Amino acid sequence: MKKNILFTIAFAFLLGTTSCNDFLDNEPRGVLSETDVVTPQNVDGFVIAAYAALGNDHYDTPFSLWPYGNVRSDDAYKGGSGTNDIQTFHFFEISNNIRPDFGELDGLWYLNYVGIGRCNKAIAALNKLSDVQYPNKQKRIAEMKFVRGHFYFMLKSLFKYVPYVDESTPIEEYPNISNRAKTDQQLWDAIAADFEFASANLPATQAEVGRPKKSAAFAYLAKVRLYQAYEQ
């Protein structure tokens, strides 16, 4: 009797597992092609996604480097309830036990490249449309180059040598690009080029709050050149 019960339970389990697999393993009903997505009506979605990558967390999103700059340089205290509270930043504060495998560093690196990837995708999509199809084309490309320049500036300031990819870089080539493919000065020049384009193509004012304008691009360009001129 006991064997029959165990057999029944095992059979029911196998039947349920098979049923679940059949239920979950469905063929896609439809796939969006590039022509479906890259349209004048949809292209702003690529731009908004790039802005969204800026985030608002002060530890590992690309908008602020205070734990990696101000805390390390004695301009700010880590804070918290003790040395074990966000211990990684305590190590930055005392310049001790700093390791390259800290999750916060990896998170910052990863999220900056998520933002760069979204900017590249947006620029590539915008380039597929004509100015007639999408009158804001140049302005939106300038916005994306401004935001991409910001992401790269953050990476360059913290890591110095980073792999450089833009909208013309095939995705399959990403793993093959060395962080020494560009020299220190070439990286600064590439970042500056984005802000130069932005300063030439952004309007003096923006109707929507949060979008960069010409003066912001000039200011960021000046900041990049100052950092570039500082030997370190």
Predicted feature descriptions by range:
Residues 1-28:
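Bacterial Sec-dependent N-terminal signal peptides
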Residues 20-68:
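Membrane-proximal, proline-rich intrinsically disordered regions
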Residues 29-33, 97, 167-175:
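Short linear capping/connector segments at secondary-structure termini
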Residues 44-48, 52-57, 82-159, 176-189, ...:
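Conserved, well-structured interaction surfaces
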Residues 145, 218-224:
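TPR/Sel1-like alpha-solenoid repeat signature
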Residues 156-157, 163, 206, 227-232:
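Short coil/turn linking the two alpha-helices of tandem helical-hairpin repeats
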Residues 161-184, 232:
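Short coil/linker segments at helix-helix boundaries
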